């Protein structure tokens, strides 16, 4: 019984080994060493005879022995269909992975260190061109800044500086001050006094208007449509006019007299 069990297990092991390749299995079945598999020695001899051809036909690799090795770099195989994987080369000739990136950096450094003066203009030029190329079709691609206005050229340099430093609303004051400086100190004193009187007059007028508003009485809502309704529409039209208004006692007396007169009749 033990021999039969060992022969059966050996036959199963041999069958599993021979399933890997049809050519190897056919050669082993035709050989004389594999004709009699009843004994353990014949079984081991058959396995030893078939093992070299089996390893030659289907080489065993570490890890997944049943799979063939990848013919290409895994990263290139997976990412080669993306346009940014080629690093600017045509037909995928650039090396993928870290080597391609390092090669590209070396090329950029070599171009930067080439002959010719290096300055800020040389560095910022390509970047600005690249940005305008990529963002020119968007309306927000260009940065929003102040509108460019035509530069006014003045014959005098001082006028040009004052026009650029101060807005339009201060130009009159600047011209007035220049005229006063040209006249002399007496003219400056007179103009200062005139300004003080003008300011004092404006303040006095504002205070007078405020006092008149306070003395005029309670606040009236004349700017609202319900502030002052017409007299004929007050109280729901009960009081139509001032002439028809009579004391309430007189109305009651007249009503009593009319009722008594009707009862007497």
Swiss-Prot record:
The signal peptide annotation in the UniProt record is: 1-26
Q: Which domain of life is it from?
A: Eukaryota
Where are the stretches annotated Disordered?
89-138, 209-240
Can you summarize the PTM annotation of this record? Specific enzymatic cleavages at paired basic residues yield the different active peptides.
**Tissue and organ expression note:** ACTH and MSH are produced by the pituitary gland.
Mark the residues carrying the PTM Phosphoserine: 162
Spell out the disulfide connections.
28-50, 34-46
Glycosylated residues: list them: 71, 91
Q: Which residues carry this modification: N-acetylserine?
A: 132
| GO MF assignments | G protein-coupled receptor binding; hormone activity; type 1 melanocortin receptor binding; type 3 melanocortin receptor binding; type 4 melanocortin receptor binding
Main localization (coarse): secreted
Q: Which residues form the propeptide?
A: 106-129
Query: Where are residues bearing Pyrrolidone carboxylic acid (Glu) located in the sequence?
Result: 173
UniProt lists compositionally biased (Basic and acidic residues) regions at 118-138, 210-235
Pfam families hit by this protein = ACTH_domain (PF00976), NPP (PF08384), Op_neuropeptide (PF08035)
Sequence positions bearing Sulfotyrosine: 200
User: A GO BP term, please?
Assistant: positive regulation of oxytocin production
- Valine amide carried by residues: 144
Family according to the record: Belongs to the POMC family.
The protein's matches in PANTHER family, at most eight in alphabetical order, are given as:
PRO-OPIOMELANOCORTIN
Entry protein name: Pro-opiomelanocortin
> From what organism does this protein derive?
Bos taurus (Bovine)
**Lineage in the entry?**
Eukaryota, Metazoa, Chordata, Craniata, Vertebrata
